[in-house]
């Protein structure tokens, strides 16, 4: 039990460090790829709200009403819709959002992470303008959607594609986040495009942490400290799961002893 509280303190300490030293934009949680439970989200909401840090929830799809209801109950600060490929999907997300939140405004972002979405970007932005705040480019899925082994997240093709998309996003009045398997190599490649991306790419993200692009690219250990938060979060999550299953294990043993 003591390990859980110790990890919790380390988690908060790391969050504060990211806020104070690296300009932390927000913490992310996912119902989609991460498969977070409602309990996981409650913990993250408790920790982030105590420190005055925004929490964004990546829902399971454009029209994931159940996820949006959970987001409303938790009081998250933003919603992220994955795999948005068409103007219709943007409209579905906005309608689902309004069905729960009405006129209440929170941060809204959509993920461009397939070839189809990239090719439809201008049509997507026509619907998204004045309604969506941010576009996130998910490089991992986006590169895989081309079915070409030469096209990898850090490839020249992807860097050129991001540059092309970024100008269209900015022209539409939205901010731009880049994510998808960020590594030290990614950061080095991005630095080579820093002049071209200046004023276009707003932030960079790992699975859990969103930092300003300039800080992630230029400040020593920004990526390392972002990943450290996720490591602590996963360790804490595993310890809690271990504790909760231990109660069930003991109960099962008692039941068997009665037979």
Task: Place the predicted regions along the sequence by residue.
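Expand to "…catalyze enediolate/carbanion chemistry for C-C bond making/breaking, isomerization
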Residues: 1-259
């Amino acid at each position: 039990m003591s390990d859980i509280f110790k990890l919790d303190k380390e988690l908060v300490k790391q969050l504060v460090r990211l806020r104070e030293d690296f300009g932390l934009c927000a913490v992310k949680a996912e119902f989609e790829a991460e498969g977070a439970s409602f309990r996981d989200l409650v913990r993250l909401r408790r920790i982030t709200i105590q420190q005055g840090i925004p929490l964004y929830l990546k829902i399971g799809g454009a029209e994931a009403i159940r996820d949006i209801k959970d987001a409303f109950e938790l009081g998250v600060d933003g919603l992220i819709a994955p795999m948005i490929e068409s103007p219709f999907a943007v409209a579905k997300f906005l309608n689902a959002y309004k069905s729960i939140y009405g006129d209440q405004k929170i941060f809204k972002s959509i993920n461009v992470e397939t070839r189809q979405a990239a090719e439809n970007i201008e049509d997507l932005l026509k619907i998204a303008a004045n309604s969506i705040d941010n576009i996130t480019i998910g490089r991992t899925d986006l590169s895989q959607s081309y079915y070409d082994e030469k096209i990898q997240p850090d490839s020249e093709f992807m860097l050129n594609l991001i540059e092309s998309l970024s100008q269209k996003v900015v022209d539409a009045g939205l901010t731009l986040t880049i994510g998808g398997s960020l590594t030290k190599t990614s950061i080095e490649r991005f630095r080579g495009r820093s002049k071209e991306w200046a004023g276009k790419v707003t932030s960079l993200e790992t699975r859990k942490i969103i930092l300003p692009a300039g800080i992630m690219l230029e400040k020593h250990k920004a990526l390392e400290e972002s990943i450290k938060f996720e490591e602590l979060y996963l360790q804490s999550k595993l310890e809690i799961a271990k504790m909760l299953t231990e109660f069930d294990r003991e109960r099962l043993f008692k039941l068997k002893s009665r037979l």
